[in-house]
């Protein structure tokens, strides 16, 4: 590793000092903990999800899953070079979309269910219209969004005409899909962006990064509004709380955490019963009372968010869980894994 010159070291020290000051200011305003305030609340039942369906069709690691707004259909992306749209009620495939690049890392369904987007190591985001077929009978590609200098790690639709992406070049991009142009393009973090979650009202979003921080953004502006610290390793995934007043995050540092936007800091921390797994993806129930995280050991863990009590483990996958997604009505959880399976938990 090259030696850091004194001037650069001075800047590092100054930045670290500022960060520590932010942390100290936040800590000074923490007059109580969530556990203290919720100690007299009743316990929630142990999580009752069980693996009801296994969606088989991929022949390589499945890296991502996302539900459509109808809570019935979901899309998965795999290193076999295919997107598959599933009917989760019947476990049937609705469409199979072959990709030009097999290295897909993220997928997204538009809330309307009209479009899906994907991207990965091809350094671009590709959008398909699921209601229109090309000459070969597969969903028609309508946009190829290029200009990235790193892999695409996350993408989410605001609506059928607008998309937000995060990528390995540390950038956040906003796209007008009708025109096929970027409306915003800016550096979001000091490291690869790993996850992105939209607020319930679609006016703000949270990003997580390998720089160990999460940030709050307004969809209308470039600069972040708030920055959150706490994790000791990469922030793998973030998920907005259904109230819109907070969010959860998880990391391979073997913790998940809850942050309150109004308190401007972490309010809870969740750990597995045995500290033997890091986490790759997180989701909150529609009530916000349950937090679920997919683990690198192949299980989905659940906690009572208020009392910070572990409420169960969903077992079935045989390898690392890569992504989990809860359908909008909260009745089904989908998980993907390196074991090539997509599991539905009901």
UniProtKB/Swiss-Prot annotation:
Q: Which GO terms describe its molecular function?
A: phospholipase activator activity; protein heterodimerization activity; signaling receptor complex adaptor activity
Query: Per UniProt, which keywords does this protein have?
Result: Cell projection, Cytoplasm, Repeat, Sensory transduction, Transducer, Vision, WD repeat
- One CC-aspect GO term: cytoplasm
Instruction: Please tell me where this protein is predominantly located.
Output: cytoplasm
Q: In which tissues does this protein get expressed?
A: Expressed exclusively in photoreceptor cells in the compound eye (at protein level).
Example GO BP:
G protein-coupled receptor signaling pathway
PROSITE patterns, alphabetized: WD_REPEATS_1, WD_REPEATS_2, WD_REPEATS_REGION
Q: Which Pfam families match?
A: WD40_Gbeta
Against InterPro entries, the record matches this protein to:
G-protein_beta_WD-40_rep (IPR020472), Gprotein_B (IPR001632), Guanine_nucleotide-bd_bsu (IPR016346), WD40/YVTN_repeat-like_dom_sf (IPR015943), WD40_repeat_dom_sf (IPR036322), WD40_rpt (IPR001680)
Coiled-coil intervals, chain numbering: none
What SUPFAM superfamilies does the database record attribute to this sequence? WD40 repeat-like (SSF50978)
Q: Where in the cell is it found?
A: Cytoplasm; Cell projection, Axon; Cell projection, Rhabdomere
* Each WD repeat, start to end: 57-96, 99-138, 147-185, 188-227, 230-269, 274-313, 316-346
Q: What does this protein do?
A: Guanine nucleotide-binding proteins (G proteins) are involved as a modulator or transducer in various transmembrane signaling systems. The beta and gamma chains are required for the GTPase activity, for replacement of GDP by GTP, and for G protein-effector interaction.
Its assembly, as annotated, is: G proteins are composed of 3 units, alpha, beta and gamma. Interacts with Ggamma30A/Guanine nucleotide-binding protein subunit gamma-e.
Q: Which family does it belong to?
A: Belongs to the WD repeat G protein beta family.
| Protein's name according to its UniProt entry | Guanine nucleotide-binding protein subunit beta-2
Originating organism:
Drosophila melanogaster (Fruit fly)
Q: Which gene encodes it?
A: Gbeta76C
């Amino acid at each position: 590793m090259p030696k850091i010159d004194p001037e650069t070291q001075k800047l590092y020290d100054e930045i670290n000092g500022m960060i520590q000051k932010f942390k100290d200011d936040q800590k000074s305003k923490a007059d109580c903990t969530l556990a203290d305030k919720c100690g007299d609340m009743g316990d929630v039942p142990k999580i009752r999800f069980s693996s009801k369906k296994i969606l088989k069709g991929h022949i390589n690691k499945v890296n991502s899953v996302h539900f459509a707004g109808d809570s019935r259909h979901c899309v998965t992306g795999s290193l076999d070079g295919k997107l598959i749209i599933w009917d989760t009620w019947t476990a049937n495939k609705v469409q199979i979309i072959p990709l030009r690049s097999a290295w897909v890392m993220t997928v997204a369904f538009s809330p309307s269910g009209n479009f899906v987007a994907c991207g990965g190591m091809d350094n671009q985001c590709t959008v398909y219209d699921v209601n229109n077929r090309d000459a070969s009978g597969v969903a028609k590609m309508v946009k190829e969004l290029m200009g990235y200098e790193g892999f695409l790690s996350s993408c989410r639709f605001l609506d059928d005409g607008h998309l937000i992406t995060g990528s390995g070049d540390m950038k956040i991009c906003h796209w007008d899909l009708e025109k096929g142009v970027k409306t915003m393009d800016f550096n979001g973090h000091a490291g690869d962006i790993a996850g992105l979650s939209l607020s319930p009202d679609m006016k703000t979003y949270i990003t997580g990064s390998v720089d160990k921080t999460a940030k709050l953004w307004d969809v209308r502006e470039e600069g972040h509004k708030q920055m959150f610290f706490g994790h000791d390793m990469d922030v793998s995934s973030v998920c907005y709380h259904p109230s819109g007043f907070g969010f959860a995050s998880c990391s391979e540092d073997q913790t998940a955490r809850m942050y309150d936007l109004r308190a401007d800091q972490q309010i809870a921390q969740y750990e597995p019963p045995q500290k033997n797994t890091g986490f790759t993806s997180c989701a909150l129930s529609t009530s916000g009372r349950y937090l679920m995280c997919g683990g690198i050991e192949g299980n989905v863990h659940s906690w009572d968010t208020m009392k910070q009590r572990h409420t169960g483990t969903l077992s079935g996958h045989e390898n690392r869980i890569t992504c989990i997604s809860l359908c909008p009505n909260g009745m089904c959880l989908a998980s993907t894994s390196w074991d090539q399976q997509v599991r539905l938990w009901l």
